[in-house]
Amino acid sequence: MLSEIWRYPVKSMRGHQLTEATVEPWGLAGDRRWMVTDADGSFLTARELPRLLLGVPTPGADNGLRLHADGLGDLVVPAPGADARERTVQIWSSSVRARDAGDDAAAWVAELVGADVRLVWLADPTQRPPNPAFARTDDRVSLADGYPLLVTTEASLEALGGGFSMRRFRPNLVVTGSKAWAEDDWRVVRVGGPGGAVFRAVKGCPRCVMTTRDPDTAEGGREPVTTLARLRRFDGATWFGTNLVPDTPGAVVREGDVVEVLEEVEPGAGPLR
C-alpha cells in the first residue's frame, strides 16, 4: 500500500507530504522544478549548503512559491515569465536552460544559506534525459538528481534500525506492507490498481552525505550512512530506495492506493546497478 507521497518544490529544501499527486513524465507535478545555483549556474544542494534544508517552499498560483524560514520574512516568488533572464545551468553532467527568479529571491536564499546564490525555475522540463544506461532515450527528468521519482519502503527503513526518519532519504513514494529490500527486485510496479500509475524501476539509489543532515536542524552526523555501509554496501556505495520512471503520465497516485509488483526478479542480487 502507498503510505506516503512527498513533493520537493525546490531542490534540497523541505518537502511537503501530500494525499495525492499527479504523475508527469519527469516526476510528480511540481516536484523539483526550482533549484539553487551559484553565480556561474552550477547547481547547489544541502550537500554543500546544509541550511537549504531549513527553507520551506509552499507552491502558489501559476507555479509560484512562498518561501519561509524561521528568522526570515516570507517571500512570494512568482514563476519567472518568458521575459525573465534565461540562464544555462548545470546539474551533474546535464546542462539545461532555466529562468532566473530575480534579485529578491536570490537575496532571500543567500541570507538563508550565507552564500552568493541564485534561484532558478525550469520552465521546460522536457530538456533533460536520465542516464541512458538505465532509462529510455525518450524518458525525462526535471531537477531531481537522476531520475523522476524515488520509492522507499517502511520495511527497509525498519530493517536499518536506529529510528531514522524517512525524511532523511527524501522519497517521493513510500510503500508499506512489503518485505525489507523487496524494492531491489521490482522492475514494474503499479499504484492504484487497473488503470492506475505504472512505473519502471530502473536503478537503485546510492546514498550520500545528504542523508546525514537532520532535516529539521540541518545538523550533520555519521548516520545513517554508517549503518548503510554495514548493511547495504554494494560496489563501493551505500544504497537505499529505488528510482522510478513513469509510464503513465497523467495518472494520479493517492495515499492508501494499492501497490502491485507487475514484474520482478529473483531476490538476492541487491539493488539494480
PLM segments and residue spans:
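Metal-cofactor-dependent catalytic cores
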Residues: 1-273
